[in-house]
Design a protein with these regions (language model features):
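N-terminal secretory signal peptides that target proteins for export/translocation
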Residues: 1-11
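Non-catalytic cap/lid and distal C-terminal segments of serine-dependent acyl enzymes
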Residues: 30-309
């Protein structure tokens, strides 16, 4: 006797996605470094806004500081705080939170966010903004030399749920507010990240637009590491949210078992356009590197904050 065809229920699909995502974690942890882009591509250089300029007052950077999260128990993370020279405790400051904070806070590598913020705040091309540079959690206070290899990065960054936003809202922002006067306006809070940090920035704003409404994603991993490839479809089928989104990627970005990064980012941009979002997509010829994102960070922040002072 023939058996009736098996019905694939929503629960079955969810279980399949969980198993698939879980199975991918060991592979991800052992993945080799991304290949170098072809010769003659990814030739991006830093401009004057990424260099210290005469007459521009410098903000101060504190850190690394240590945080032990309740949302992600048994993890330890580093974070840094940037405070611009123009900060006035009587005036609430805007807030910009950088994922993989060690990369963005470094003033000798590609992004040099403190220098860029010094220059743009000085010229009033962005508001007086406190920067919070946060690393993912690790299972020990002995961190790996390569901070991208901390143990909880993929769990926190690639999982498309509200846990990471909850850590920011319930833990780190209140901790920061003990020391500085911060805005409560979601239009004056931004999230920035690269690769898995890029999808993390988007996820936190997507889940909590009542807290975060500005997003910058560099070479964002909108692929099937833990289910983030669903976002272009969710964007099209979900009521528009009050978000402003900047995406950057390159034609030589990754293509592996988790997906194709250039196609994933193009799909995100197409979905944002279809839904009428305030977005910008910069698509170059770079690979899975920080050169393009770093070179255009000043213009990115000018665009992101263009109507906020």
């Amino acid at each position: 006797m023939m058996r009736p065809p098996m019905r694939i229920t929503a629960a079955c699909r969810l279980l399949f996605n969980v198993v698939l995502a879980t199975a991918s974690v060991p592979v991800l942890a052992q993945a080799p470094p991304p290949p170098s882009p072809p010769a003659g591509t990814d030739a991006y250089t830093l401009g004057p806004d990424s260099q210290p300029q005469p007459g521009v007052p410098r903000g101060k950077v504190e850190g690394p500081l240590i945080w032990k999260s309740r949302v992600f128990p048994n993890t330890v993370r580093e974070y840094w705080i940037y405070v611009p020279a123009q900060y006035d405790p009587s005036v609430p400051a805007a807030v910009m939170i950088f994922q993989d904070g060690h990369k963005y806070v470094n003033v000798e590598q590609e992004y040099r966010a403190p220098i860029v913020m010094d220059n743009l705040i000085h010229r009033k091309e962005m508001p007086v903004t406190i920067g919070l540079f946060v690393n993912p959690g690790h299972d020990s206070e002995t961190f790996p030399e390569n901070r991208f290899r901390v143990s909880n990065r993929s769990v926190e960054y690639d999982t498309p749920n509200g846990d990471y936003a909850r850590m920011l809202i319930d833990e780190l922002l209140p901790e920061l507010a003990k020391r500085y006067t911060l805005t409560t306006d979601p239009e004056r809070r931004a999230l920035v990240g690269a690769s898995s940090g890029g999808i993390c920035a988007f996820t936190a704003a997507w889940e909590r637009p009542d807290y975060f409404r500005k997003v910058v994603s560099h070479i964002g991993s909108f692929t099937n590491i833990r289910g983030g490839y669903h976002y272009p479809f969710l964007l099209r089928r979900t009521d528009k949210k009050p978000l402003r989104v900047f995406l950057q990627d390159g034609s030589n970005d990754l293509d592996n078992q988790f997906g194709n990064w250039p196609l994933a980012n193009q799909s995100m941009a197409a979905a944002l356009k279809f839904k009428g979002y305030d977005y910008r997509f910069e698509f170059g010829d770079g690979g899975h590197t920080h050169k393009h994102g770093g070179a255009i960070l000043p213009d990115t922040l000018r665009w992101l904050w263009r109507d906020v002072r």
